[in-house]
Amino acid sequence: MALYPKAVLVPVTIVASCVCLSVVSTAQISRTDPVQVKPPLLRTIDPPSPDAAATDLEKRADELHGQKLYFDAIDYYRAALGKLSIPADQAKILNKICRTQLVMTRWHDGKKTCQQAIKANRKFPDPYNNLGVALYEEKKYGAAIKQYRKAIELDDSAASFYSNLGAALFSKKKFEESAKAYQRALELDPDVFERSSRQGVQAQVPRPEDRARYDYTVAKLYAKMGFSERSLEYLRKAMEEGYKDFKDAYKDEEFAELRKDKRFTELMAMKNPALPE
């Protein structure tokens, strides 16, 4: 006689409970799984037209650069470059390519392109400045200073050249020379620290430990020139950064007039944990 396993009757409520538990368990697991987000749709830019004039291609490249579409901008700049035969015109476009590469932090590529621009027109100051920026970002401050000085020799009216020179000198801890360069930059353009250079990337003080002293130096320069609002702004930054000699503001001659301003008194009275006693 054949033997069959006895059928076991399971209450429906138990089965339903198991199903519910399974669903709950699955739901709990799904919440721990990584959620895959689809990448955003890429913005497509039409390639440069082979029939477009160099000026139109350059204008479009400038627009793309302004929109931060840097790869597309470079494509258009290179297309414009291919239509030019005069070295001075080529240098202008090469400098713009260099500028875009620097914004993208492609320092090596930027250096090579700047050098090509200099070779095309050695009387054009901007690529010297931009080459200096690339060297500065590589912490080659001495080499950067050399390039900034070359740019200034060719054009001593560009505030950004002096500002960049000041930053490189500051990083070399040549503070007096740095202050002179910064002062000249401010004389040429009081807004120089608020903007980038006309065809390049304005250098900044890289090390956090230098930032407080930099802000204090700029505050002194603005105070000396009578720009109270901006002096107080940078003085506040220096305080917040914990500048160790902040109390020198009570005696530095550059702040003589500013000390008569009640806002100076209020600022100095502020209690800030970062401010050394």
Predicted segments with their positions:
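Canonical tetratricopeptide repeat
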Residues: I93-K96, N130, N164, R198, ...
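Structural signature of tandem alpha-helical TPR/SEL1-like repeats
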Residues: L69-D75, K92, V103-Q116, E137-K150, ...
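Conserved structural position within tetratricopeptide repeats
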Residues: G82-S85, Q115-K119, K150-E153, L186-E187, ...
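Short coil turns that delineate tetratricopeptide repeat
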Residues: D51, S85-A88, R122, D156, ...
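Alpha-helical segment of the N-proximal tetratricopeptide repeat
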Residues: A52-K83, K92, R99-V103
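Start-of-helix register in tetratricopeptide repeats
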Residues: T55, D89-K92, D126, S160, ...
